[in-house]
UniProtKB/Swiss-Prot annotation:
Compositionally biased tracts (Acidic residues): 20-34
Main location: nucleus
Subcellular location: Nucleus
Membership in a protein family: Belongs to the TFS-II family. TFA subfamily.
Span list, region Disordered: 1-200
InterPro entries according to UniProt: TF_A-like/BEX
Protein name listed in UniProt: Transcription elongation factor A protein-like 3
Residues found modified as Phosphoserine: 30
Length: 200
């Protein structure tokens, strides 16, 4: 609650109506500003005085407490808004004049992300270019990663040929022992048994 009060006080200072400090020139203005707020609040009742009176009379005659509850709710809502009249802005006061308190429907809050999108067409074009450039960079990085992975695979296949220069390693295709199954390079149709090899 303290944070809300701090925000309201900040708004009042911005509007030129601080609660504690009032300059002599501002006293007349603040009195004039408060008078329209007081006049604005009875306006919803002035719009429908007969309609509000009828449900109360019918509710008492017929004994329906639901309609009495609604009228009490209206009184509470308007009574609650009186202490905060200084904190209300002019637009809120106008909105209160247009519709009664029971028809209050909260508005949809605007998303913060939507506010920054309509800056200017130049900014949007720059954003598109930045996105395009970043996608190109991503493609380059992916290509570099695939190259590095391929080189790593080749080195792993080559195994222990550290004495051979790298240029020669790329040309060599590693071949494992031909006669043993389950080893790299071995296997396939050309595999022979130990008895088929002429010299052991």
């Amino acid at each position: 609650m303290e944070e809300v009060r701090g925000e309201n006080e900040g708004k009042l200072e911005k509007e030129g109506k601080p609660e504690d400090e009032v300059e002599p020139e501002d006293e007349e203005k603040s009195d004039e500003d408060e008078k329209p707020d007081k006049k604005a609040k009875p306006a919803p009742r002035q719009g429908k005085p007969e309609e509000e009176a009828k449900p109360d009379e019918q509710g008492q005659d017929e004994g329906k407490p639901e309609k009495q509850g609604k009228s009490d709710g209206e009184g509470k809502r308007q009574g609650e808004s009186k202490p905060d009249s200084q904190a209300k802005s002019a637009s809120e006061a106008r909105a209160a004049e247009k519709r009664p308190a029971e028809d209050y429907v909260p508005r949809k809050a605007k998303r913060k992300t939507d506010r920054g999108t309509d800056d200017s067409p130049k900014n949007s074009q720059e954003d598109l270019q930045d996105r395009h450039v970043s996608s190109e960079e991503m493609m380059r990085e992916c290509a570099d990663m695939t190259r590095a992975q391929e080189e790593l695979r080749k080195r792993q296949k080559m195994g222990g040929f550290h004495w051979v220069p790298r240029d020669a390693q790329d040309a060599l295709v590693p071949r494992g022992p031909r006669g043993v199954r389950g080893v790299r390079g071995g296997g396939g149709r050309s595999q022979r048994g130990l008895h088929d090899i002429p010299y052991l």
